[in-house]
Design a protein with these regions (language model features):
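Glycine-rich, basic loop-to-helix element that forms the pyrophosphate-binding segment
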Residues: 66-83, 104
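Conserved donor NDP-sugar-binding/catalytic core segment of glycosyltransferases
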Residues: 100-131
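Short loop->beta transition adjacent to catalytic acidic/histidine clusters or analogous donor-positioning motifs
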Residues: 3-6, 27-38, 46, 58-62
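N-proximal low-complexity "stem/linker" segments adjacent to membrane-targeting elements
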Residues: 1-27
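Conserved nucleotide-sugar donor-binding catalytic segment
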Residues: 81, 138-214, 218, 222
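A conserved acidic beta->alpha catalytic loop
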Residues: 25, 32, 40-49, 68, ...
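Acidic helix N-cap motif at the loop->helix transition within catalytic regions
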Residues: 17-20, 45-53, 96, 100
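Short aromatic/hydrophobic "clamp" motif used to bind/position activated sugar donors
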Residues: 88
Length: 250
């Protein structure tokens, strides 16, 4: 494990339209002690050609292709297994970071002795245009808080691997990131929020996140099968999630 090296975990699948901008946002970081591990879940577009162009230019960028299409959870877990950094950050292959992201968040963690952190983020469209919507995280959140209403943007997370170790991402198609945060919060009491916008989250028209019926099913599986909650608690959390979604409709 290399001290103060940040391992950037990036699963990808058919993201050739966006992944070049994602990689560029990493290369431009003011904090330069990083490795970017891109694990490809058997893309059928031009993802491979784009990524290999950058691996040939920068040895810090590493590319691994799964033997068969297995889902984002398996790709994330593989990237985590391959990582050697003492810190781990997560970046989806269509999201972007401002150039001060790693430096600012590393300083925030060290100055406050935090092991698990996230940040605010903004939404952009498929052409990188701002949607003028900022998603704010909470100052700190525990396991029950994440169960009730997860305030964590996946591509904002950074955690201390030396303190917390590595984790296997629960193998569910959606909400596997939430399941990972819940695992970490069984070991670390809080995730601490940094009140700065340090990520741009891309809203895509064909995103799996847009199918609300499927999301209810994934939530149910997360609560019942992964977290072993009772039927009552699972129904309560799903109803609360639906309430939050409805309350945000203008």
């Amino acid at each position: 494990m290399m001290k103060d090296l940040i391992s950037i975990i990036t699963p990808t699948y058919n993201c050739g339209q966006f992944i070049e901008d994602t990689i560029k946002s990493v290369v431009k970081q003011t904090y330069q002690s990083w490795e970017m591990i891109i694990v490809d879940d058997c893309s059928s577009d031009n993802t491979k050609e784009i990524v290999e162009k950058y691996t040939s230019q920068d040895k810090r960028i590493k590319y691994h292709v799964l033997q068969e299409n297995s889902g984002a959870a398996v790709a994330r877990t593989k990237a985590m297994e391959l990582s050697v950094g003492s810190y781990m950050a997560f970046l989806d292959s269509d999201d972007l970071w401002p150039e001060n992201k790693l430096e600012s968040q590393m300083n925030f963690m060290k100055e406050n002795n935090y092991a698990f952190t996230c940040t605010d983020y903004e939404q952009i469209d498929e052409k990188n245009n701002s949607l003028n919507k900022i998603i704010k995280t909470k100052k700190k959140t525990n396991y029950n808080g994440v169960l009730l209403s997860c305030p964590i943007g996946n591509s904002t997370v950074m955690y201390n691997v030396e303190k917390l170790g590595k984790f296997a991402v629960p193998n569910i198609r959606k909400r596997n990131d939430d399941a990972l945060w819940l695992q970490i919060l069984k070991k670390e009491k809080y995730v601490y929020g940094m009140p700065n916008v340090l990520m741009q989250y891309r809203v895509r028209n064909n995103s799996i996140s847009s199918n609300k019926v499927d999301l209810i099913r994934y939530h149910w599986y997360l609560y019942r099968e992964i977290e072993n909650l009772s039927v009552f608690r699972s129904v309560f959390h799903i109803c609360f999630w639906i309430f939050l979604k409805l309350s945000r409709i203008k």
